């Protein structure tokens, strides 16, 4: 892998994002607005907001980064940009790492802003260390980014890329334990939840929120990081020059 080529790709993506203020607004404003909405939905029940607010700090950035990166990568193919880049002496891994660097940086800023607003302005309380919550929120956003880059290879249009949200992300939201504890689900659904990335992302944030810093938390984080690397590797293997 060439560090210079990957960094050049990242700088190009940064330049594109800078010229697209609407995307920046979507990335930075929407997750924060959703957390604020939750705060005022449970204004008379602060305990509920504290219980679900910490896990959602990681889930909202996961969703937005998944959506933005999958659409952006598809647009690069359909406009011919990806084909021109791959005609150059640039390895697939260099290209994907460059995109990963750019979107990981955006994900870090996004998750940090959401966390600062939640803890500073919305008075979200957590029993665990706030710094660790921010780190996990960033990790989950990067996971969403890597999965978005990978799954974009299977879409031919932006509409199809958007459809991955209800097809791939929404079932994970239902089964990760956010709505119903997994041990209270039907056995087949509980087993299925162990194969979903968002289960481990949610569990990690939930444990930090409850100040359960133990080996299970380390396992959850390790699974999230492993899946992130795996998704990027699969993305490099399935990367196509253009959409057929």
Regions found by a protein language model. Give the residues of each.
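Transmembrane helix-boundary elements of multi-pass transport/secretion proteins
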Residues: 2-83, 92-112, 118-133, 137, ...
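Transmembrane helix segments
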Residues: 37-46, 155-195, 199
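Juxtamembrane/transmembrane-helix interface segments of polytopic membrane transporters
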Residues: 110, 114, 118, 148, ...
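Hydrophobic alpha-helical transmembrane segments of polytopic membrane proteins
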Residues: 132-155, 173-176, 226-233
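Short, membrane-exposed interhelical loops at transmembrane-helix boundaries
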Residues: 198-212
């Amino acid at each position: 892998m060439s560090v210079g080529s990957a960094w050049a790709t990242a700088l190009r993506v940064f330049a594109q994002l800078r010229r697209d203020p609407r995307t920046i607004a979507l990335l930075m404003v929407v997750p924060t607005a959703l957390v604020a909405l939750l705060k005022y939905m449970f204004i008379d029940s602060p305990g509920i907001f504290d219980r679900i607010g910490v896990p959602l700090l990681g889930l909202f950035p996961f969703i937005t980064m998944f959506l933005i990166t999958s659409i952006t990568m598809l647009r690069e193919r359909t406009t011919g940009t990806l084909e021109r880049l791959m005609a150059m002496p640039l390895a697939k891994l260099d290209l994907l790492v460059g995109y990963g660097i750019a979107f990981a940086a955006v994900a870090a800023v996004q998750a940090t802003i959401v966390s600062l607003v939640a803890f500073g302005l919305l008075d979200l309380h957590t029993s665990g260390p706030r710094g660790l919550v921010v780190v996990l929120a960033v990790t989950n956003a990067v996971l969403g980014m890597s999965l978005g880059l990978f799954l974009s290879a299977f879409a031919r249009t932006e509409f199809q890329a958007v459809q991955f949200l209800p097809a791939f992300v929404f079932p994970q939201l239902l089964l990760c334990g956010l709505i119903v504890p997994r041990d209270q689900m039907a056995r087949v659904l509980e087993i299925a939840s162990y194969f979903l990335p968002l289960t481990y992302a949610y569990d990690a944030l939930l444990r930090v929120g409850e100040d359960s810093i133990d080996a299970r938390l380390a396992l959850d984080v390790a699974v999230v990081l492993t899946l992130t690397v795996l998704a990027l590797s699969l993305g490099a293997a399935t990367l196509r020059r253009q959409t057929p």
